[in-house]
């Protein structure tokens, strides 16, 4: 069986397969340690945390995980819970569910629980997965909401502070499924130094310790690199006026493709 890095961060575009092959969740489970996995599930983004937490417990239990715990954080004081912190200290993986990314950040940001999660991820001690809202929070800057399907403009996107787990990225999810290219470009117009990552449903960008992003799943991962952006009218036009952005680099990556975050170069996957 292929060995996967425990230090991986799996950023999922939402609506991942939970019934049939469950390819993305299987990858998370393997990275977590398979039958030896110790998995913390954080459903705090959801309006129904008990239901969604139990659903993922059932999925990972069916795969063979024996040690799972739902960290049901519903107010900020629970971010100081010693039992939760002790479980995060010993677990091999943490999974953040979908829901509302503002709610998730409001509950977890700057808590002792989140600080320890961030430290363990940075040290490569634990696998982290996040889907939908759990993916949106990964960067320092976060897309908190907005609209779809228009020309890029500043009014199209609402920004907030994320959890800073992968600080250099801005993530959008349900990407092509909800026509969100324009709002990702709108976000990047004010933060061209960040790497824009748009992830389709049932698709995952696997951030690996070796600086590579690997794509798995049924859709694509869109990468917008604004590092060489030569011009934007972001500060010169009204909020609802169209934005101009010059000299962006665009990559559309499919299953098996990779992207090097250091060299900013894509690599084609091996066709089997």
Curated annotation (Swiss-Prot):
GO biological process, one term: proteolysis
InterPro entries according to UniProt: Class_I_gatase-like, Peptidase_S51, Peptidase_S51_cyanophycinase
Top enzyme class: hydrolase
Residue positions of the active site: 132 (charge relay system), 150 (charge relay system), 174 (charge relay system)
GO function terms (MF aspect): peptidyl-dipeptidase activity; serine-type peptidase activity
Signal peptide extent: none
Keywords: Hydrolase, Protease, Serine protease
Annotated catalysed reactions: [L-4-(L-arginin-2-N-yl)aspartate](n) + H2O = [L-4-(L-arginin-2-N-yl)aspartate](n-1) + L-4-(L-arginin-2-N-yl)aspartate
Highest taxon in the source lineage: Bacteria
The enzyme's E.C. designation: 3.4.15.6
Protein family membership: Belongs to the peptidase S51 family.
NCBIfam families with a match to the protein in the record: cyanophycinase
Job description of the protein: Exopeptidase that catalyzes the hydrolytic cleavage of multi-L-arginyl-poly-L-aspartic acid (cyanophycin; a water-insoluble reserve polymer) into aspartate-arginine dipeptides.
The protein's name: Cyanophycinase
Native source species: Geminocystis herdmanii (strain PCC 6308) (Synechocystis sp. (strain PCC 6308))
């Amino acid at each position: 069986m292929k060995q996967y890095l425990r230090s991986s961060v799996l950023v999922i575009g939402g609506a991942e397969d939970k019934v049939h092959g469950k390819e993305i969740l299987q990858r998370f489970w393997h990275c977590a340690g398979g039958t030896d996995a110790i998995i913390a599930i954080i459903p705090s983004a959801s309006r129904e945390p008990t239901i969604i937490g139990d659903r993922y417990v059932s999925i990972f239990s069916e795969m063979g995980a024996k040690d799972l715990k739902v960290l049901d954080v519903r107010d900020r004081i629970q971010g100081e819970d010693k039992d939760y912190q002790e479980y995060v200290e010993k677990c091999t993986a943490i999974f953040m569910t979908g829901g509302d990314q503002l709610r998730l950040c409001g509950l977890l940001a700057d808590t002792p629980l989140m600080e320890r999660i961030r430290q363990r991820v940075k040290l490569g001690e634990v696998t982290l997965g996040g889907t939908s809202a759990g993916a949106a929070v990964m960067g320092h800057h976060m897309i908190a909401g907005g609209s779809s399907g228009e020309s890029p403009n500043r009014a199209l996107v609402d920004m907030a502070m994320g959890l800073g787990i992968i600080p250099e990225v801005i993530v959008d999810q349900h990407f092509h499924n909800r026509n969100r290219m324009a709002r990702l470009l709108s976000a990047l117009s004010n933060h061209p130094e960040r790497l824009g990552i748009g992830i389709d449903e049932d698709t995952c960008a696997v951030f690996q310790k070796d600086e590579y992003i690997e794509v798995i799943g049924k859709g694509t991962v869109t990468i917008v690199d604004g590092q060489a952006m030569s011009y934007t009218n972001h500060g010169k036009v009204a909020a609802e006026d169209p934005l101009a952005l010059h000299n962006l680099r665009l990559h559309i990556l499919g299953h098996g493709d990779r992207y090097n975050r250091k060299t900013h170069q894509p690599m084609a996957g091996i066709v089997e």
